[in-house]
């Protein structure tokens, strides 16, 4: 009986250590799972456009991260904070029309249903000064770190 409890406890420790790493949700190594998607913050700086292209090249279905509700915003903020970056971080939102209005869609095509915008400019990133919890308008041609997101493959 004592040995059975010891083995069960050992398996529980292994399971808990893998939670959040993506290992138990079929995310690639280094990616983190949340609500059906995998996320990764890249410790390299790129312009908004180059960051989006980089995300797309990682695999089909990958884009700069979309933030569609507060729970996801908090998850992404914590993930970015763990990287201990000292700069803004690109997300997948940018102005796409001449009236300087926000696009109604994220880079992955999903509708914008949650907004946390401070100012209206062309590209948006997470503001380091607020612990990555608010969006800040940034010049698209500046290079910042970025966070990519992908759907977990169906049937995985």
Swiss-Prot record:
One cellular component term from this protein's GO annotations in UniProt: extracellular region
An annotated Gene Ontology molecular function: toxin activity
Keyword Transcription: no
Domain C-type lectin: 34-149
Keywords: Disulfide bond, Hemostasis impairing toxin, Secreted, Signal, Toxin
Localisation per UniProt entry: Secreted
Tissues/organs with expression: Expressed by the venom gland.
Signal peptide location: 1-23
Keyword Cytoplasm found: no
Cysteine pairs bridged by disulfides in the record: 27-38, 55-148, 123-140
Additional free-text comment from the UniProt record: Shows greater sequence similarity to the alpha than beta subunits compared to other heterodimer snaclecs.
Family indicated by similarity: Belongs to the snaclec family.
Subunit and interaction comment: Heterodimer; disulfide-linked.
Role description: Interferes with one step of hemostasis (modulation of platelet aggregation, or coagulation cascade, for example).
Name of the protein in its database record: Snaclec A12
């Amino acid at each position: 009986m004592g040995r059975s409890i010891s083995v069960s406890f050992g398996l529980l420790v292994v399971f808990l250590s893998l939670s959040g790493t993506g290992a138990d949700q079929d995310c690639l190594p280094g990616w983190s799972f949340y609500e059906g998607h995998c996320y990764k913050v890249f410790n390299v700086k790129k312009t908004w456009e180059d960051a989006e292209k980089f995300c797309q090249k990682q695999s089909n279905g990958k884009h700069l991260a979309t933030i569609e509700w507060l729970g996801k915003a908090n998850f992404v903020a914590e993930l970015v904070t763990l990287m201990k970056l000292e700069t803004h971080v690109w997300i997948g939102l940018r102005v796409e029309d001449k009236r300087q209005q926000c696009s109604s869609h994220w880079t992955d095509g999903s509708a914008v249903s949650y907004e946390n915008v401070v100012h209206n400019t062309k590209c948006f990133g997470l503001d380091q000064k607020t612990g990555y919890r608010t969006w800040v308008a940034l010049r698209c041609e500046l290079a910042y770190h970025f966070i990519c997101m992908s759907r977990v493959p169906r049937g995985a």
